[in-house]
Amino acid sequence: MYSKFETEIVVRPSDIDYNGHVHQSVYLDYLLFARVDQMKRCYKVPIEEFFKRGFSWATKSTTIEYKRPLFMDETITVRTWVKEIKKMTVKVCFQLLKDSGKIAAQGHSIYVLINSKTGKPVAIPEAIIEKYSI
């Protein structure tokens, strides 16, 4: 079992589409912002640490179910947790929660650790697996 972490984000005017709510593509921006924040703040492994070691994370796939719209000036909570770690991939589940606590969107992403020079997948070092196993 892995811990769940949360990051709060305030919806900006630039996030709003012509329907008056957050555009669907912005949900991915929120997820990215939250993951980078949580890697540094919660896991104590900032993304820059991966870059220094010659690694990077690439998104293999993301699945999102949109349930409720988000609106300007709403403070949302992005909750994420590691669901599964395999040899070269990490499955991260997420929820975007409205002010009310109701789920606005949910889903998961699969990330692949890659060698920054070759662009090829590499095995996740045991030290990283240990950091994520909190």
What are these regions (language model features)?
Residues 1-60, 114-134:
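Hot-dog-fold acyl-thioester-processing enzymes
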Residues 3-7, 71-72, 83-134:
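HotDog/MaoC-like acyl-thioester-processing domains
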Residues 10, 23, 65, 77, ...:
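Conserved beta-strand segments that form the floor/walls of ligand-binding pockets within enzyme
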Residues 39-84, 89-90, 104:
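Hydrophobic beta-strand-centered segment that forms part of the acyl-chain substrate-binding groove
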